[in-house]
Every structure is written in C-alpha cells, then in structure tokens.
C-alpha cells in the first residue's frame, strides 16, 4: 500500500477549476526529435518530414550523363555502441549508427552486364537524444535550445525620412533563396530591391514577369482606357492626358560578323511621353506612328491614389518585357546579357524556381493570410499574383487603406525547434555528400561498383558533429538542479545563426508584447545583456507544426463557457480580435458566468465587458508564466523585477544533502520533479521484490497476453544513480522511498534525492525566520543564521569535481602512470596504487598527488655528477620528469571513485588471446540468438494456434505461408525461420541467425482476427528489439576485446579521479528565497544568542525588514505567515499563482494553529534575555543555498605566476593570480600620501623583475629592503615606441 512517507498531501487554496492536465514539460524537445527521426513509424508510412524529407530532397542522384542513378529507399538506425552512463564516464558521444538503404541502377545500354544493386550503407554516427531530452557530446550533457526567428512570408513596414515623408516597404523573406523588397522613396516612386543591394523601378520587374507594355501595367490597377488611334477618336481625346508613351516601332536587319547570319532587332522611338496632354498637332504624329491604339487616363478613377504608379513609370527606362529583363540582368550581373533567354532565366531562377527558392509551408501560409490569395500550400515559390498583390497592398498603405505589420507580434515570429535545426544541418551534410557522389560517379566509367563505394560517411557526420559541438544553440546543459534542466530545455532564444545579435537588438524586440500572454513567459528572462532575447515557454504552451506557439483557451458561446469539450489551442494570429476572459472569472457547473461584468483582454487592451461579449476564457491562472515562475507562491504580491530574480535564482539552488519540500508550495512541485525524468517512476501496478541503496527490483502485474508477447523477465531491475557528478559539479544521489513487499501504483515515485523530497521538487529548506535587525549584521541584505543550521547539516551540499590526466605517446617515448615518482617522498605517494592513481576513500588537500605520471626527458649528455648519481641509484630517475596531477589550491575532499581507460598493447600473444576470446563470445552470441529464436517460435505457435493464414508475405511479394494454410509450430519454423535466408547473403553477418527471414516479412494481417494480428505485431517488434539488444551487447564486447577503450588519437591511457567535497554553510555563501530576496551570510550565531520565541524556540535565520518595502516583494511575508501555520498544524499548502490564499485565508490558518492573527509575535533577545519592545514578524520561509559558494571564490596569493610580456602577476583564482590594484586605488593611496606603499605596489609587488628578486633575498637574509628599479611596463612602452622608430632612453 502507498504510504504517506512517499507522498506529500497539500491543502489547496485554488478557487478556479482546472480540469486540464499539464503537458509533458519536455515535450518540445522529445516530440521534435521523434518527429524528425520517425523511428516508430514503418518506412512505408513515414511522412515527408524531418530526416525522410532531407533524403527525399537530395535523392535520386545521377551522374552528368544520367547513366547511373542512386535512389534512396529507406533509412534505419542501429542500437548505440555504449549506453548513456558509459558515454558520460568515457567522455564519448552517445550516438547511433545511421544506415540508408540505397539502390544503384544503370541506364547505359553499353553496360548491360550491370546489375541493379540494393545495399545498406553506413552514413555515420549521429548523436541521439537521451530519455531526459539532452544529448551526450564528448561525455558532457548538452541541450539544443529552440530559436525564435522571423517567420518566412511578407512583412509591411513604415519608416520616416529625415524630411518627415512617410516611407513604406514590403519585404518577402523565404526559407531559402533571395530576399526581395519593395519600397517607396521621398519622390513617391516605388523600387524593387533584390538581396538588399540591386535596385530598379517596380514597373521594370512587372514588365520582366510578363506585363511588358504600359497598358498591361495600368490594366493591373484598372487605370487605363484604350482608344483606337483614328483621327476622329484622337480629336475627341484632345485635352486628356496620355497614360502610356506613344512609340514608333520598326525592325532593323544587320549581318552578324561572327556567323554571317542576318539578325533582326526591334527598335523603339518615343514620340509622346506619358502624362502629355493631347493637342491638335499631336493627331498626325499619333496616326503616322503606326500605333493601333493610344492609352488614356481613366476619368472615373481617383488618379491621386495611384500617383506612385505613374511616377514609377516615369522613372522606368524600359518599354518592353525584353528591355526590362535585360536591364535587370545588367543590374544584377554588372554586364550585358549574352542573349534574351539567359536574362529571362535569371529572373526565373531567383523567385520562380523551386530548386533555388522556397517559401516553405509557413511562408506560403503567411503570404496567403496577409494578401488574401488562395494559392495551394504546395506552391512554395513566389507567383506573379503575389508580386502584384504586394504592390497593391503597398499602394493601400500609402493611401491609408491598410495597416503595417507589428514585427514583434508572435504571428510574425516562429520557433525553430531542435528537429528543424537538425533538418537544416542534415540538408547541408547530404548536399555535400551528393556532390561527392556525383563526382565519384563521373570518374567511374563502366566499371563495377556498389553504393558503398560512392559514399564517404565522414561528410555527414562532420557537419552534424560540428553543429552539436560548436553551434551557438547547442549549449552545455545547466544541470544544477532538476528545475534548471527543465528550464534549459524549454528555453527560447532569439540569438544564434539567422537570429538577432545582442548588440543590434533594440528595446522593442526585447520588450513584453501582448501576444506573449500564455506563450512566452513575461517574467523569466536573464538580467544581463540578453534580457528579453532569451525567454521561456509558458506552462501550457506548445509549438504547432508550423513553428508558431499556441496556448489553450476554452470557448465561450453566447456567454456560456464550453466545459464539455477539450480546450482549443490558438496561435497569436488566431486569437486577435477575440475578447478573452481571465481564468479567475467565476462560472457555475453549466458554464454560466456568476458576475455580469467580466474583466477581459482584447489584443493589447483590458476592457470590462458583459458575459455575452466574451469569446474565450483562459484555462489556468498560471497560464501566463513559465515553470520556474509558477513555483513562486504568492507571485501576485511580488514586483515583476523581483519575481524575475526569484525565477532565475531557483535555477541556481544547489541540491542539498537533506532536501525538504516547501511547506508553502504552488502545487506544481510534483509535476516538475516527475517531468525532469530524474526520478524512477513505477511503469505499472506491481510489488517491490527487492530494494537496497543501489537497485530496486519490481514485479509488475502482467496479463497472460502481455507475458506472451514480451521477452523480458517478469522482474524489472532499476539501478539507482549514486553520487554522479553533474555538469555544474553538483551531485545526483538517489535513494529509495519504497519498502520491500510494498505494493505500488502506476506513476508512483520509487526514489528521492537530487533536490526532490517524496516526489516533489525540493530546492531548499523551511527555516524559522524573524524579520528584524540584528546587531547591524543584516545590513544591506546580509543574513544572520543560527549555528544549528550548520550543525544539523540543514544547508550542507555535496559537490563532486572530476580530474583527468591523459597518458600520451610522445616523440621521446611513452608517458607512464606510476607511483614511483622521482624526487618525491614516500609520504606523498602513500595513497597511490600501482598505476599511480589515488585510492578511493583517501582524504586529500591542496598539493596532494592525485595521479602519478612520469614523462621521458629530452636526451642530453649528463654531467659527471649525474653520471655518478645514476651509477649509485640506478638509471630510472635520470631520464624522466614528474608530470603528476596535484590537487589545486583550496581543494579538500574525499576520493569517491577512480577510473582508468586503456588502449591494449599490440602484442602478438595478446592478439592470439583476444582472437580466442572473440570466438568464445561469438559462440555465446550465436547460442543466445538461437535460444531467442526458439522462444519466438514457441510464442508465435502459441499465439497463432488454430488460426488460418491470410497469406504471410515477404516484402518482395513472395508468399512464405500460403493463404488458407493452418498455422502450426512446424510450418512457422520451416517457413518463417528457415535455416537459410534465400534473400540475404549470410557472409555479411556475424552469425547465421542474424540474417533470419522474420525481419524481411510484412507483419500485417496474418490472420482474420484483428486482436491476434495486433499481438503478432507487438511480438515481432519485441523480438526484433531483443535481438538488436543482444547484437549490440555482442558488438560492444567484441569491440572492447579488439580495440579496447575508445580514446582519442595519441592517447594511450586516460585516468579520472572524482573528489567529493562536503560544503557546509559558511559566512560568505549566497542564499535566497523564492521572491528575489537574496543575501549573503554575514554571521553564524550560536543558538543561545539568536532571538527566541516566548516558548524558548530560537529562530533559524534573521532577515532585514528594510529589504521588503522598497523591493515590493510582499509575497515573502504571506509565505512566512502561512508557513508558520503549516508548521504548527503539520500541513503543506498549495497556493497557485493568481489563485492562491487570500489575506483572510492566511489569517484563518493562523487562527486554526492558535497563533496571533496580526502576524507578529513577541520575541526575546538571546543576548540580553530581554523581550524586544515591538512584536516581530516571525514565521517559516523557504530558503535556498545558491551555487555562488565562498569556498569557490576565496583566494589568496603569496608567490605565483607572472605574465610573460608585462611581467605583472596574472589575475583570477584559476591562474593563482593577484588582486588588481587599479587606477582608482592608486588615487586613493595618492590622496592619503602613502608614497612608500604606492611605490612598493607599482614596482616590487608588480613588474620590477630585478627588484622583486632582490626583495625576496633581503627578506630571507633579514636585511633592509633595496631601492626599487624601473618596472618592466616602462620597458614594454619603450619597445613599442621603438617600433614607431622613436628612441627613448631612461635616466
């Protein structure tokens, strides 16, 4: 039975009904990755998405003569060589082998002997996501952060010229291809820009895409009236304006000197310009020009609206489509086009070719939505209609009939999830691979070759590895605590390739926008230069297939909330124009609002409206914020700036040795701990068979059907993580919370640890607090803490540091790990084993040898003294030097683990021995597979007993068991598991059993019973999984024997030492609450000196009351008082944000606990024993210890390293550097007239090389200090001036 020791039950103060479950908080990472690989989807059912789409876009590949064609059929991934833990230990990448099935065919009639070849080809090892949504790259966990960037599509903007004229522009941003921009200028002319550089009138572009004449262009906007060019008609038109030029056109013939051909060229001469008013004398000119008609301005249209078109036509020098395309070619290439077709092709390739230009599904959707065009989503290129509609929309903007876009609106920004980023990297890798395949095909003429001969696996894996290792969005995972992990995986960054840069990002893009509501957290963002550029996804938000962030709402129809149906998820664009009620608007069980006035949101406004005007309602009060901000109780009483700090500081809380869940929580603590994937969760109902500190064995309740299709044992073993180091050197150590024989329910937590307590997130401890000054020690946010907190290990944490040493093969010989180190005392090596590695359990301090290593010295002639010493003490000590790893300054701890990885020696006897061992494990592997096969035959026979076959087919179409035949053990064994697979070459496999037929069969509709077919599918899937696991294990064992541990080139051995440091709370450590109330421990006071309650209970912590009013984080006071009541009553509370306990409810809890309801208590001074004059706010507050520990920062230097050039001491603790005495500090000493101290600091303590050596000598001899010399920095200055040919001498 589940006991209360495995669960915290909380009293909730929530008033709103929240029937909607939280989504999986890691869904954005896990689902994106699964959708990219489509692992669980059979090849024939895969969507043209993710990896499958990349292959489809790059294949088929053919040579330049189309003789050979390489087609893509399918891809699959094998099991990884090492599991996640092994990769972390060995510093390897957790990756899976990617294999593609390719078909090579030949169309060359001269090469009829060539057989079509299908082959599975290895494309490289691809980093694979762990269950926790991270990647292990070179032994370190990393996260791919999602990127927020501008959505593809069309954007309309407005700017102002310096003279005050409004300028309008439209920019089309594609996924792939050239940008095109349309913009107006101060002269009211519209230009088109291609790739932000080449500019020409927009009418030139319109002519180039098929609207060649002035009449065609004017007709697009309904501006022209065509009149037949007769004398009578022209006479009637006298006094009206021409809308198009009157041209005289003729054809000229000339002989091409190169070819001798006669070539015709059309010529134009402008007789009358646009906007000319027709006069009497123009009649004959028009008639004689040979023009069939003239184009006049329409009199029924307001010409002023279209002035820009007329102005642009005036600027346009071209008169036909041919002239326009040639003019654009000249602009783009800075040279004349060789012929008209080349000029046309360049326009086509820029915007109308799907090979060069791609708007993507999103871009097409955005353009259709904006311009109201009805293009199908399959049209991924720009169309003529798009260009015309954009020009029309711009004219509408100029005439104030349309609105510009808000670039910060979330409909114009989309998320590039990890899957999409991988897609673009694979596209680059496969495009490179396609080029090399093409080159190799062209080289191989009529000779036999296979697909594997064309492919270089390194091409793809180098691109992918460089992305995971160096890309700005592939980040070292923040693993301080489970919340830090979850937040990092849910992060949205506007930085990175193709995004913003923090230098260029202005205030608007960083600011909160009304569309962020329910999508991006309005609170959680960094405080530094990245403020507003890095955000976090809200708790209920999700990213849709197009990359837009959606948030859920309940529909409200005629003032009644739809409580029966599931909420609808809406993007920012879909939500525009709707009145949305807040989640705390009360309604009854039928959905009728209780109040007749409802507070609502309408885009960026907040009206109070009648219920029947409401369209939607929020589903939860914490919908507006992220996971971290949702964990702050009484957030509604805190200033946003402090809440931001509270959110960020929870991520820095170090996991404690004895964590404790908060008394006052928000109800989300359990969900965060579960979704972090840190804890072990029961997969089904069952019983605990065995439990100890290292493992838990569970026997789950399985049905006979489940047992039949499973190959696993009934008992499942879970290993608990013990003292594992995280990326931030904190410690994961899990311990069981269930007991032997206990019955558990599905979803129940089996262990705790790593900042969790009974399945809930526990980042800190509940402490008895008093808000009062104490002897001035809590001035300026400093904290006074009781000795009891230190003594009882309340804030003690364990930190694990990893030290590694590589043994290399150098030019002078191989380095060696040993405990026999020259010139070192026996005392120093007493804890080293024979490999020179310190023993587990040894206590170490700074300067101790952790790993003993010797390196060969350079060969040089020894002096006579050395020869003598060698003769006496042996040859060993002379030719090697000590290269051991020593404990760095300030390190004190206990060795908890050591590891040694080695590459085996290439010895003949060892090779023979390992060959025998490989044969042994190969035999065992073959036996295991045969046993599995036998088990599978038994299970299939039992499942299909008495059933009639509906036809068991091979995927090539052959029938293996004919339709109508009854299944039996005999025909299953003979036909499904024959001794030889006729479709596969068994020489390609390790053992014959690997090539069995089952994997090639269509596992579909073997019988007429649907249920049995489903079970056959499950059974075959489980069998193939088990077979792959067995194969993976064999490959790993064989690899270990043949190759040894995988180590980088040139490294023979790798030794690792893990040291655990127990960090008790100290003066100087940083602590914080959840409301942005941070401070540094200033004094640890004895229990008896701390202020105490009237019953004698001393408080644990004293905070300064002045830290509350100016910071406006009153939430901490509410938390303090409710925490006090909870402690007295033995209750834990859930007070969800914006829906938590009211002032009255807090008072009621205090009353129930028999505590003063004013929230203040009489306190007694521990030092004097006298009561304080005024009552003090005393309660229980949740405090965390942050990662900024004084032990990591404390540093002192006596003698240390100097910079080579300036000869000044280095800076920083890592370099064992000094404290910089800067310009302002020098002023301070000058102001005091402390000349000698100043001289000493600027010379012998800094860069007076000779002076500091002499000073040391004088101190040793007890003499007076010498006069300082000239500092080295003066010499550096002199040398630099000499570089400018200026000679300076110092006297």
UniProtKB/Swiss-Prot annotation:
GO cellular component assignments: DNA-directed RNA polymerase complex
Highest taxon above the source species: Bacteria
EC number(s) from the headed UniProt entry: 2.7.7.6
CDD domains xrefs: RNA_pol_B_RPB2
The family this protein is said to belong to: Belongs to the RNA polymerase beta chain family.
Record text on subunit structure and interactions: The RNAP catalytic core consists of 2 alpha, 1 beta, 1 beta' and 1 omega subunit. When a sigma factor is associated with the core the holoenzyme is formed, which can initiate transcription.
Full protein name: DNA-directed RNA polymerase subunit beta
Gene of this entry: rpoB
């Amino acid at each position: 039975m589940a006991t209360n020791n495995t669960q915290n039950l909380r009293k909730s103060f929530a008033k709103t009904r929240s029937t909607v479950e939280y989504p999986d908080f890691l869904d954005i990472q896990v689902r994106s990755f699964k959708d990219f690989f489509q692992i669980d989807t059979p090849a024939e059912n895969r969507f043209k998405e993710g990896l499958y789409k990349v292959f489809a876009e790059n294949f088929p590949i053919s040579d330049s003569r189309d003789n050979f064609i390489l087609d893509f059929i399918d891809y699959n991934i094998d099991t990884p060589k090492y599991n996640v833990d092994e990769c972390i230990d060995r510093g390897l990448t957790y990756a899976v082998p990617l294999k593609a099935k390719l078909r090579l065919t030949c169309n060359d009639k001269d090469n009829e002997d060539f057989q079509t070849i299908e082959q599975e080809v290895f494309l490289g090892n691809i980093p694979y996501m762990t269950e926790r949504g991270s990647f292990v790259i070179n032994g370190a966990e990393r996260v791919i952060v999602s990127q927020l960037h501008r959505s593809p599509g069309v954007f309309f903007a407005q700017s102002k010229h310096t003279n005050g004229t409004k300028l309008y522009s439209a920019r089309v941003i594609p996924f792939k291809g050239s940008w095109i921009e349309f913009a107006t200028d101060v002269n009211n002319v519209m230009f088109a820009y291609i790739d932000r550089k080449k500019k020409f009138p927009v009418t030139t572009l319109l002519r180039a895409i098929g609207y060649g004449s002035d009449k065609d262009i004017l007709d697009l906007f309904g501006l022209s009236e065509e009149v037949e060019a007769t004398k009578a008609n022209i006479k009637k038109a006298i006094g009206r304006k021409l809308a198009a030029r009157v041209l005289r056109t003729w054809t000229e013939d000339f002989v091409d000197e190169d070819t001798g051909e006669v070539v015709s060229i059309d010529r134009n001469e402008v007789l009358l310009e646009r906007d000319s008013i027709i006069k009497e004398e123009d009649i004959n000119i028009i008639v004689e020009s040979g023009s069939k008609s003239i184009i006049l301005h329409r009199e029924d249209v307001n010409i002023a609206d279209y002035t820009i078109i007329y102005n642009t036509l005036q600027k346009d020098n071209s008169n036909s489509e041919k002239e326009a395309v040639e003019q654009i070619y000249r602009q783009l290439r800075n040279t004349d086009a060789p012929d008209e077709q080349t000029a046309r092709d360049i326009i086509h390739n820029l915007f109308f070719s799907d090979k060069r230009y791609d708007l993507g599904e999103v871009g097409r959707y955005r353009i259709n939505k904006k311009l109201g065009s009805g293009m199908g989503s399959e049209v991924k290129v720009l169309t003529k209609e798009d260009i015309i509609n954009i020009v029309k929309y711009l004219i509408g903007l100029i005439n104030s009939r349309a609105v510009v876009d808000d670039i910060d609106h979330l409909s114009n920004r989309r998320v590039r999830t990890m899957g999409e980023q991988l897609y673009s990297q694979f596209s680059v890798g496969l495009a490179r691979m396609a080029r090399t395949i093409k080159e190799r095909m062209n080289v191989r003429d009529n000779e036999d070759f296979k697909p594997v001969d064309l492919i270089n696996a390194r091409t793809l894996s180098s691109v992918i590895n460089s992305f995971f290792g160096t890309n700005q969005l592939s980040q070292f995972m923040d693993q301080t605590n489970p919340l830090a992990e979850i937040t990092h995986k849910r992060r949205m960054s506007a930085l990175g390739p193709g995004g913003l840069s923090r230098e260029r990002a202005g205030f608007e893009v960083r600011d909160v926008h009304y569309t962020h509501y329910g999508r991006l957290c309005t609170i959680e963002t960094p405080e530094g230069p990245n403020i507003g550029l890095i955000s976090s996804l809200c708790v209920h938000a999700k990213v849709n297939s197009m990359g837009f962030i959606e948030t859920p709402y309940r529909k409200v129809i005629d003032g009644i909330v739809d409580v029966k149906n599931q909420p609808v998820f809406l993007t920012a664009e879909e939500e525009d124009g709707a009145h949305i009620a807040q989640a705390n608007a009360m309604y009854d069980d039928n959905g009728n609002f209780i109040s007749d006035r409802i507070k609502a949101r309408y885009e960026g406004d907040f009206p109070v409206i009648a219920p029947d005007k409401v369209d939607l309602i929020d589903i939860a009060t914490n919908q507006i914020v992220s996971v971290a901000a949702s964990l702050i109780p009484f957030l509604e009483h805190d200033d946003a700036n402090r809440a931001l700090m509270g959110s960020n500081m929870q991520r820095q809380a170090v996991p404690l040795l004895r964590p404790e869940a908060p008394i006052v929580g928000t109800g989300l603590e359990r969900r965060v701990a579960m979704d972090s994937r840190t804890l072990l969760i029961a997969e089904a109902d069952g019983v605990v068979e065995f439990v100890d500190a290292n493992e838990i064995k569970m026997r789950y309740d399985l049905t006979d059907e489940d047992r039949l299709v499973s190959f696993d044992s009934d008992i499942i073993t879970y290993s608990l993580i013990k003292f594992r180091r995280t990326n931030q050197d904190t410690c994961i150590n899990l311990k069981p919370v269930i007991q032997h024989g206990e019955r558990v329910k599905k979803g129940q937590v089996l262990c705790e640890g790593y900042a969790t307590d009974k399945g809930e997130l526990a980042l800190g401890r509940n402490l008895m607090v008093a808000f009062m000054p104490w002897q001035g020690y809590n001035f300026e946010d400093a904290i006074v803490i009781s000795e009891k907190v230190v003594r009882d290990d309340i804030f003690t944490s364990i930190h694990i540091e990893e030290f590694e040493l590589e043994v290399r093969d150098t030019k002078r010989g191989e380095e060696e790990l040993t405990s026999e180190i020259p010139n070192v005392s026996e005392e120093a090596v007493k804890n080293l084993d024979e490999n020179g590695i310190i023993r587990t359990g040894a206590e170490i301090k700074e300067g101790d040898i952790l790993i003993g290593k010797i390196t060969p010295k350079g060969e040089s002639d020894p002096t006579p003294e050395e020869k003598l010493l060698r003769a006496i003490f042996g040859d060993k000590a002379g030719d090697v030097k000590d290269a051991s790893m020593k404990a760095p300054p300030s390190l004190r701890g206990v060795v908890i683990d050591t590891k040694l990885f080695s590459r085996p020696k290439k010895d003949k006897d060892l090779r023979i021995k390992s060959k025998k061992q490989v044969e042994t494990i190969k035999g065992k592997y073959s036996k295991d597979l045969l046993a599995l096969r036998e088990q599978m035959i038994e299970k299939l026979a039992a499942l299909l007993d008495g059933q009639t076959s509906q036809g068991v087919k091979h995927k090539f179409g052959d029938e293996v068991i004919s339709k109508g035949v009854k299944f039996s053990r005999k025909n299953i064994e003979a036909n499904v598991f024959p001794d030889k697979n006729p479709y596969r070459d068994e020489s390609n496999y390790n053992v014959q059993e690997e090539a069995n037929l089952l994997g090639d069969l269509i596992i579909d509709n073997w019988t007429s019973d649907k249920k049995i077919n489903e079970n056959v599918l499950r059974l075959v899937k489980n069998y193939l999984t088990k077979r792959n696991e067995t194969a993976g294990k064999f490959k790993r064992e064989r690899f270990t024997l043949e190759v040894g541990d995988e180590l980088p080139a040139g490294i023979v051995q790798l030794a690792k030492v893990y040291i655990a440091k127990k960090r008790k709370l100290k003066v100087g450590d940083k602590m914080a609450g959840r409301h942005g109330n941070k401070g540094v421990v200033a004094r640890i006071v004895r229990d008896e000196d701390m202020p105490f309650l009237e019953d004698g209970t001393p408080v644990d912590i004293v905070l300064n009351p002045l830290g509350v009013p100016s910071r406006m984080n009153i939430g901490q006071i509410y938390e303090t008082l409710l925490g006090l009541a909870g402690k007295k009553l033995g209750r834990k509370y859930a007070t969800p944000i914006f829906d938590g306990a009211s002032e009255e409810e807090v008072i009621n809890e205090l009353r129930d606990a028999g505590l003063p309801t004013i929230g203040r208590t009489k306190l007694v001074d521990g030092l004097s024993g006298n009561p304080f004059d005024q009552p003090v706010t005393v309660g229980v507050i949740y405090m965390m210890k942050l990662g900024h520990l004084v032990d990591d920062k404390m540093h002192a230097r006596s003698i240390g390293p100097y910079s080579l050039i300036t000869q000044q001491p280095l800076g920083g603790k890592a370099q064992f550097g000094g404290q910089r005495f800067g310009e302002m500090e020098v002023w301070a000493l000058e102001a005091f007239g402390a000349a000698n101290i100043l001289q000493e600091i600027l010379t012998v303590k800094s860069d007076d090389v000779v002076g500091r050596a002499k000073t040391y000598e004088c101190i040793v001899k007890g003499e007076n200090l010498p006069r300082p010399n000239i500092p080295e920095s003066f010499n550096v200055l002199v040398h630099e001036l000499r570089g400018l040919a200026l000679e300076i001498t110092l006297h």
